[in-house]
């Protein structure tokens, strides 16, 4: 290794210490690593790795990557790429608008590790702040759409539309296999819908929205406002199509709904769209939170997360994720969707935008946008230029002008570019000018001069040109939360009050197995708010985004070097989306060979729930493969099922190391077997943190792999998103990666439709992973993998005498995570894995992953970023909890199995200071069971949440303030 923690001070190379970041990222220095190795019986790292990682999979060469760069040098190099991005003022529209994120929200949410380092709120008691923010988001969506319920975000508008189509088929009573799509939808939305429909066997019929009245469709999707900015009243059309048992979905601009009649008022069953306009930068396509609102009767068919109101064991109002039995981690191939992570951080930002501005503020912003567009249209109309014609009289923000000829349209378009403005071309002679929250007086002068040769000032009076029949008459955002925090002090304190209710990685380790909660370094996060990365439209002209594309290309090369694959697609904007894109490439590949019937997907029974859910979305038949007693794929069963389904075998989905936390010795044999029978190997990259620099998935036989940039490559989890799931693939699959109708991908075939709304998915967070790889360098990345493996084995060794470690490799070693078995303890004492998870909160820790991949277990993944001291605190907590369980069993000090600190956990401050303490253990035992807790106590804000009550009494909107009193 070329990295030294203590470089010499007699050379400038040593004094500069370019690899310093490596030891900022790693939790243990060389001396501490030696202690960890010694504790598990090793003198050096090499011997430990030889016992842990099977020799047949090892990569015995350096990664083809540069050496580590310092934080300053990496930022400087990224700055040179950013400087090669031209940030024109965007008037493109097409689903993306410039915004102004309030500074108080940017600094205290987007840039705050208390918000962005948290995990999906499965442990509700230590996630009440994030859950409340998501409930606010849902309330915004409910108010603006007029529907009864809303989810806690989807990935983007286009994938939300595809989910709406799938939901329509589940809910509709029509037996039709046709889905109608309004020809006024955005091109990227239709692109993703076409992708999704194909493998379900649904026919997508595109036409004028009025034509939907006469057909037989299981569902219909209408755009409101249309791609040309036009506003149409859909009431009559919706009423007509519903008579034919057609389920109606309306895609709506969230900002327009502040002024316009709601989709529910027009009869819609579902309303969906993007909330990007609520303060989220365009970011070259993302990330942004899509919204999805629906009726109460359809709640069990809706995709994605839903936050609901419940109560805790003390009878207090508490929030939780509701109706989880619909989701992939429980229902697997029967799930409504393969959605795992969504866009929680972005949903929280959008919801806070509404909280900060309130109903009056958002109405002022929406009215200003519309008034700008109206004033601009008036200038064009009053110019009396026969060449210029305003196409639509009823619009919200976009004015479409027919220039009479392609020549004039081109001239205006190019002149706009020359003075720093981007317009949008619609056909040969039409231009669209989309106004936004950022439009100002100077813009108005320049834009009017471009079209009518004379600059015009804004008129004194702001005019609403929409007919009154289009305008909403009901009140919105009436809940107190939207009417209480309009000064910065009040907003600042509200945000802080929510942050303090949540346990994130700025408080303690989050050792969730299969989730890789590692450091999200500050220097990695800085570039996401640079205007060059934040404020670029995804459909901006290519010559303006040279630096952006260079950064993405550079990241692709980094990922190719790490994985060994020939090409990488950056479009999937989550791990689940990456799975979908990977299987999509496999199916398209088989079709290119004329093997359209290769539709069987073999999946080990230990697989992530997203795997079978994704396979079903691709129209594949899931065949489950057994695992043996050691947690490995049962080779005999795999062989038998490969032979049985040989003629139809499409793919094997496999995770490596396995979800059981071990390196399977036979992975090459497994891949060879699948290839022998004509199938392709899809590798789930969830556990890639055990691979980097140690092995290459392409080398062991994988054909395609998705990479969770929000796990292995340091994009933060954001409390449940954003994520990125790019796929690496071998050359024979590269032509079949997702393309994009508006921004073609270099190697993809023209007819390969998209999986995400934007060509590069959530592009604005890609600099995070670029920075991580650049600052770690080839040697640092390998060191990270080594330490991730070491930390997991240290935890396993320390706990094995207290809880059985369920699976190990042939030398007794685990990979980067370990599974401890709680079932023997439960059989002996009745104490469950859930009791331990809740009690860990009293010790200041988030629970490891519960009951996956084996029910009644905890899966622990400590990552390389955790120090030995933090590991020891966590270990001592679990040892103490075991002692508490045994004390309850023994009945010591009047403890019983029905009344002890575990079954009553977590303990809130309110419980501990209550005047009447009725428990058989002390208040100190409840709240401060170990000495270290006194210096950094985290108080859960609610007691144990009643899950059953929440699902039986589903409430997904903001409760009244009295509920919290």
Swiss-Prot record:
Species name: Psychrobacter arcticus (strain DSM 17307 / VKM B-2377 / 273-4)
Signal peptide stretch: none
Designated name of the protein: Glycine dehydrogenase (decarboxylating)
Residue(s) carrying N6-(pyridoxal phosphate)lysine: 711
Keywords: Oxidoreductase, Pyridoxal phosphate
Any GO CC annotation of this UniProt entry: cytosol
Family label: Belongs to the GcvP family.
Highest taxon listed in the record's lineage: Bacteria
Listed SUPFAM superfamilies: PLP-dependent transferases
Any GO BP annotation: glycine decarboxylation via glycine cleavage system
GO molecular-function term, one example from the UniProt record: glycine binding
Names of the cofactor(s): pyridoxal 5'-phosphate
Keyword presence, RNA-binding: no
Protein purpose: The glycine cleavage system catalyzes the degradation of glycine. The P protein binds the alpha-amino group of glycine through its pyridoxal phosphate cofactor; CO(2) is released and the remaining methylamine moiety is then transferred to the lipoamide cofactor of the H protein.
Reactions it catalyzes: N(6)-[(R)-lipoyl]-L-lysyl-[glycine-cleavage complex H protein] + glycine + H(+) = N(6)-[(R)-S(8)-aminomethyldihydrolipoyl]-L-lysyl-[glycine-cleavage complex H protein] + CO2
Gene3D superfamilies: Aspartate Aminotransferase, domain 1, Type I PLP-dependent aspartate aminotransferase-like (Major domain)
UniProt keyword annotation of Nucleotide-binding present: no
PANTHER family named in the record: GLYCINE DEHYDROGENASE (DECARBOXYLATING), GLYCINE DEHYDROGENASE, DECARBOXYLATING
Subunit structure: The glycine cleavage system is composed of four proteins: P, T, L and H.
Parts of the chain that traverse the membrane: none
EC number, UniProt record: 1.4.4.2
